[in-house]
Amino acid sequence: MEPGKRRTKDDTWKADDLRKHLWAIQSGGSKEERKHREKKLRKESEMDLPEHKEPRCRDPDQDARSRDRVAEVHTAKESPRGERDRDRQRERRRDAKDREKEKLKEKHREAEKSHSRGKDREKEKDRRARKEELRQTVAHHNLLGQETRDRQLLERAERKGRSVSKVRSEEKDEDSERGDEDRERRYRERKLQYGDSKDNPLKYWLYKEEGERRHRKPREPDRDNKHREKSSTREKREKYSKEKSNSFSDKGEERHKEKRHKEGFHFDDERHQSNVDRKEKSAKDEPRKRESQNGEHRNRGASSKRDGTSSQHAENLVRNHGKDKDSRRKHGHEEGSSVWWKLDQRPGGEETVEIEKEETDLENARADAYTASCEDDFEDYEDDFEVCDGDDDESSNEPESREKLEELPLAQKKEIQEIQRAINAENERIGELSLKLFQKRGRTEFEKEPRTDTNSSPSRASVCGIFVDFASASHRQKSRTQALKQKMRSTKLLRLIDLDFSFTFSLLDLPPVNEYDMYIRNFGKKNTKQAYVQCNEDNVERDIQTEEIETREVWTQHPGESTVVSGGSEQRDTSDAVVMPKIDTPRLCSFLRAACQVMAVLLEEDRLAAEPSWNLRAQDRALYFSDSSSQLNTSLPFLQNRKVSSLHTSRVQRQMVVSVHDLPEKSFVPLLDSKYVLCVWDIWQPSGPQKVLICESQVTCCCLSPLKAFLLFAGTAHGSVVVWDLREDSRLHYSVTLSDGFWTFRTATFSTDGILTSVNHRSPLQAVEPISTSVHKKQSFVLSPFSTQEEMSGLSFHIASLDESGVLNVWVVVELPKADIAGSISDLGLMPGGRVKLVHSALIQLGDSLSHKGNEFWGTTQTLNVKFLPSDPNHFIIGTDMGLISHGTRQDLRVAPKLFKPQQHGIRPVKVNVIDFSPFGEPIFLAGCSDGSIRLHQLSSAFPLLQWDSSTDSHAVTGLQWSPTRPAVFLVQDDTSNIYIWDLLQSDLGPVAKQQVSPNRLVAMAAVGEPEKAGGSFLALVLARASGSIDIQHLKRRWAAPEVDECNRLRLLLQEALWPEGKLHK
């Protein structure tokens, strides 16, 4: 190729001319048929523009002149100077013709548009004819022998190598063509960079670079038309090529050669006609192209771009073939079998580009071993690909290139034209060589190929004698596409998959030998024998001395419905199931409660031992009949300046004491100054109260629940009954932070104040007493709606409240199943979140039975206290201010005696201040009166068994209580702060001990004790003083420990006292 000369579409065969020529050869054998076809082609060519008539009138001697020029090229080695001058002259003449041709094109461009519509219809007919011609040519090419094709291949390749050498030498001699040499160097650099192998041929990289360049410079509007025409005709050509490829195998080689000489006549005419048609059709399809540009151009343009980048590369590879003929022949057999089907994919001017692409596919496979020796022979064909792509932008650049040629000297123009003619001759020889190679291997490969669908099996068509293996190209493209998809998928997966190196471990952990092993290794075998005394002798590792613990995963079910209440991975028979031991939950709770109490007491003793001043102050207050004493911590901020009004104990929890404190004399805490305070103490923990209760009304009396001391009942001066539930969460009540800590002040859970006005008390309450189910009798005459078990559990029982007017109300204590934090609408006295309330059960009027007929002078009798018989809670006794004790029942049954009277006859204004039943089940009780007399009554007798009138020196008795540890001992308190101890077995005439409590006056007294204690019984007196302090006096053992058979001895004493009384009354 001449330096500086850009290769155009005029330098190659046009696909339309080639198809028509092949059709003439294949369909007609006689001269008449050929003449008829030539006339038809002449008529079609006459319709073209005038500038194309000259190449249409080429005579058959043109092929001979082409061969002469090739021969001149071969002889150029001997005389390069003379041949160069002649070539330059020829090139000048050809340039003059080309300029005239360009001028005629500009003049008749408007005339082309008028004829384009009729040509489109003729072009469609020509395409159909070409389809048949190509399919018939496939069979004709199979007739060529393999030996003839190989021989011609080698000869034409050698001639082409010599002509290429001549052209290369001419290019190097011309200084004006430095631009072409620069392109050649760039092409070699790309080849060295990308390489040329079977997996990645050079045409792939050229296609890739060309695609990037084309994205930067958008195509002309007619490119989409070419893609649509190509894709629409592809399937039809593949179908016909497959059906008729085997039907023309009887044609001879001579007919093919004759047709090859006639191919050049119609080449230029059809190329110009296709250009005109393409321009006209692009103008019509311009709107439609814009809509489908983003879709069809991406899908269909990829294959056309991929195939259009390697036509010139095939020519260079053939020119540099000459080192190993056998290897080249081997590549020719492998790649020359299937190259026919892709010609019809490009209409018009692009079909010539596809011819060059097919040549590239054939020659790339043959030149893998010779790319290293062919580096200097390559040119930069990127610009050539632009020209040969059939785009209209190249036609606009042709005048510029021709103007540059006109500026060159005449000698250089001639030389360029001569090189161009040599290249045309080379193209013809390459076509003949490719046809021969295809005919040798085409039939065998065609028979081996499976006849599948048109989308999978490649169709073949002849393209100027140059063949491309599109089957392998398609396979490579699919492989590359699949590899690209796999690479993209692997890249995405690698982003998601991340190895975690946060955990490391050692595969080999070889710690150093410890001292013991080193000692045994050195000295253990000397006169010793190593023996193991533990099990698992084979394991000698450190810290391993016993067998491994067996573990098993199980699931559990609570409560268990059967003996099998758990399961795991192992399957066992139900007979092997171990019977779950039955746990006594109440016993466990009792043990835990006692254990907690013991621990708390021990901690309290340790605290007291650490404070010797506290112990010394308590020992100073010890009485002579007590072994030791202690003091409750009443110096708390909320208890300062408050006097103790009364003390109460629990018969169930003997160590529990309740103290009632009046209003403070001085203001200290504004929140508590207007409220009465009740403290629940444990005598073994004197550092502070267990619970602190507050009440707005004055508390006149109180008591604890009979069986479980978790409820506290109190009577007020306003006549209401108040209940505190000691189990409630402290978050429901007031909490105050004082100087010594954080304290919770509990308000009443339930109060009868303001509700139940029809049955509520209208006078101050004098006593509140619990009514529990008898533990000494199996049956009770009380008609209770609750079962015995429920009543014994402490969750439901009765209490009685007595006011000074003689009204006795009986209440049922009810515990709700669920607390309502929002409060109750029906129970207005219930605190929000509370669960315990009182329900009125019965009302007993005692005023009528206590009134004395004929003694109106004394007025209404006032009731002071009430007690229920422990052995039979149906019976109760009530003390009055007339010295009489009333006896009654809750069922309004007649009882005898109705009144308990003193030994003196007549009615006296003496108050019965205190009444107490014996805690040991005997039907006897003590009564202390305001005149200082103490009476011992039996429930079946109206008069006392024993009565002591001057035992307290006529001082009023304010406190009286049986000893909880000894049946024959009781304690008495008078209003002069004296304490008396009575022991009936020792003396029934008076007290056996007396103690004056001074200087701090005694206000209240209560006795606590536990006779069943394992370490021995203890008896303690809780003394409340006027200053507000509370002392605990632990009495000596002689008063606390019971004597032998003390209950029987007491009965004998009472019987002896009863006989004289009976005789006296008789």
UniProtKB/Swiss-Prot annotation:
Main subcellular location: other
Keyword Repeat: yes
Biased composition (Acidic residues): 351-362, 381-397
Region annotation (Binding to the DYNLT2B-DYNLT1/DYNLT3 dimer) ranges: 473-552
Region of interest (Disordered), residue spans: 22-366, 381-408
Keyword rRNA-binding: no
Highest taxon, organism lineage: Eukaryota
InterPro entries documented for this protein: DYNC2I1 (IPR042505), WD40/YVTN_repeat-like_dom_sf (IPR015943), WD40_repeat_dom_sf (IPR036322), WD40_rpt (IPR001680)
One of the GO BP terms on file: intraciliary retrograde transport
Compartments reported by the entry: Cell projection, Cilium; Cytoplasm, Cytoskeleton, Microtubule organizing center, Centrosome
Keyword set, alphabetical order: Cell projection, Ciliopathy, Cilium, Cilium biogenesis/degradation, Cytoplasm, Cytoskeleton, Disease variant, Phosphoprotein, Repeat, WD repeat
Tissues in which the UniProt entry reports expression: Expressed in chondrocytes (at protein level).
Phosphoserine: modified positions: 30, 247
Family to which the UniProt record says this protein belongs: Belongs to the dynein light intermediate chain family.
Free-text function comment from the UniProt entry: Acts as one of several non-catalytic accessory components of the cytoplasmic dynein 2 complex (dynein-2 complex), a motor protein complex that drives the movement of cargos along microtubules within cilia and flagella in concert with the intraflagellar transport (IFT) system. DYNC2I1 plays a major role in retrograde ciliary protein trafficking in cilia and flagella. Also requires to maintain a functional transition zone.
Disease involvement: Short-rib thoracic dysplasia 8 with or without polydactyly: A form of short-rib thoracic dysplasia, a group of autosomal recessive ciliopathies that are characterized by a constricted thoracic cage, short ribs, shortened tubular bones, and a 'trident' appearance of the acetabular roof. Polydactyly is variably present. Non-skeletal involvement can include cleft lip/palate as well as anomalies of major organs such as the brain, eye, heart, kidneys, liver, pancreas, intestines, and genitalia.
Protein's name according to its UniProt entry: Cytoplasmic dynein 2 intermediate chain 1
